[in-house]
Amino acid sequence: MNFRSPSLILEPMRILRVSFLLALSGNLLWAAEPKMQPLPAPLSNNAVASLKARGGLRLYSLMGIGPKKKWDAVSNAVYALDPDTGEWTELRPVPGTAGRIAAAAAGARDHVFLFGGYVLDAQGGETTVPDVSVYDPLSDRWSRASDTPVPVDDSVIGVYQDRYIYLVSGWSNNDAVRNVQVYDGAKDKWLQATPIPGTPVFGHAGALVNDTIIYVDGAHRNPAGSQPKYVASDECWMGKIDHHDPAKIQWSKLPSHPGNARYRIAAGGSEKDQKIFFSGGTDNPYNYDGVGYDGHLSEPVAVTFAFNLRTGKWETLNDKTPNPTMDHRGLLVAPHGLVIIGGMEQGQRVTSRVTVLPRK
């Protein structure tokens, strides 16, 4: 008579139970991370912001340019994404007669603040605007704040202590500027902070985490004075904000990040991870249509990397990021991952896609 040990009988049952629990946990994880619906309309160079208010976390897309990539394709539309459901809601548009591109947005003090950008006219002319618009999500209303002293577009934005909003460098009508401008959301006043010591740039990327600003790359005038008119910058900088004076910044140069210098990378910071993340962008600067200043078509780069504030080092997260995009004003760090909204895909196609990348 063959006798099987109880442990041998129970072992298949344990395996089945573990398999069931793993499958169940996988289903629960999938259910907890809904697929993000695409933007209601394809948009690129759109400002983005996140804000956790009474209704929970919302991710915002503001203005941008549509698939035609011409002056009459610039939008003033505003959309909000609920990351828990993956659904978008169209909100009251940004006030004004024309939409803008290359604006900067940030969530602070229970509001969304929208700064600058530029408008296009039918002849291709560009005007950087000083406008500061403030959106209240509870009332779905816009108000106007004090104008930016030096109007900028294609700048880097960051928030300090949920009060001070920093605009770092950027383009101002005729050239890039070194200004670091600080908006005091509590007093509706502006401060001029320690300017950047590096080359004035536009289309650079970065973020502010705790008291630290990190920005990289962008474009600047060709120092040779020949074609192309603008070339990519490979400079990377860190700024430490003085705890007693938000207008004082100690700047220091960082080593180059992984990969080539790039333009209009999607970037965003995470206090939880103590990292500033970067993804996509292009190594061939252009204006707004994806055609490089050198006459060649620009294409997105498939590298995602981060600056680790704990170690002070660069980290490559993925050098083969699927379906990379360019022409960004930022990325948003959410519990679901790194959220990239819209942008330009390969072939300079404006997309409505919402990409969620892992944070590791």
Which sequence ranges carry the predicted segments?
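Positively charged n-region of N-terminal signal peptides that target proteins for export
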Residues: 1-4, 11-17
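Bacterial N-terminal signal peptides
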Residues: 17-27
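Kelch-like beta-propeller repeat domains
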Residues: 31-360
